[in-house]
Design a protein with these regions (language model features):
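ATP-dependent carboxylate activation and anion-phosphoryl transfer catalytic cores
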Residues: 1-228
Length: 228
């Protein structure tokens, strides 16, 4: 999340499409949280609907914890309000306009760290969930426990949510955990920054694993059934 991720024309069109889609969902009887994924043509800036997620998603924490949401209310609170039975009247346009103000958008990034080696082993040690700190040499170390990303005080800190723990299998494509930090993870050419690579390498360095046990041959016995 950062205020200049897309130009105002694209942001305005995405809001309009989302508003129309949401109104149609209401007509269909759907209530509560939903998220839309858009595809953007980089040549002409045209946007297309990618998919609708009628649920909380992996990106929900980014928007629910953003500065604009904290200034009013997390999006998930509106989801709960919808099913609470409590009558409410919200000026949606006023809310959207305030949240669209660049001054109310702070910069955060989220990375899902995966195991990318072509092997399978068993994890014996895994980094704790909580706040991690990056040292001057690019290494990272566990600093303190917290479950809220707002506890991250600078770009030299990150919140890590562990997914793969000791005893789990580690294989190519396995999700190791989710890292959230201030600032940007990629540059304008969609390449990981040096800092992002250091975070990924640093977290991975705290995983230890052992090889899979060798398979043992099972002695075959005579069949215990007959076909007559």
């Amino acid at each position: 999340i950062f205020s200049t991720a897309f130009d105002e024309k694209i942001r305005k069109k995405a809001r309009e499409y989302t508003f129309k889609f949401g109104n149609q969902l209401v007509k269909e009887g759907y209530r509560g949280y939903f998220e839309l994924d858009f595809l953007i043509d980089q040549k002409d800036g045209e946007i297309y609907l990618g998919e609708c997620n009628p649920r909380v998603t992996g990106a929900s924490s980014m928007t629910n914890h953003a500065a604009f949401a904290h200034a009013d209310a997390p999006l998930f609170l509106f989801h709960l309000l919808e099913f609470s039975g409590i009558p409410f009247d919200i000026d949606v346009n006023e809310l959207n306009n305030r949240w669209a103000d660049a001054d109310n958008i702070d910069s955060w990034c989220q990375m899902v760290i995966k195991h990318t080696d072509d092997n399978v082993d068993i994890i014996t040690e895994a980094p704790e969930s909580g706040i991690w700190h990056m040292n001057k040499d690019g290494s990272v170390e566990y600093n303190r426990f917290d479950y809220h990303r707002r506890a991250v005080e600078s770009e030299q800190e990150a919140f890590y949510l562990r997914i793969s723990n000791a005893g789990d299998y580690r294989y190519e494509g396995a999700d190791l955990g989710i890292l959230i930090t201030r600032g940007r993870a990629m540059n304008d050419k969609f390449k990981l920054t040096k800092r992002s690579k250091q975070w990924i390498d640093g977290i991975k360095a705290h995983y230890k694993a052992k090889p899979l046990p060798k398979a043992q041959a099972v002695e075959m016995s005579d069949p215990a059934f007959k076909i007559l």
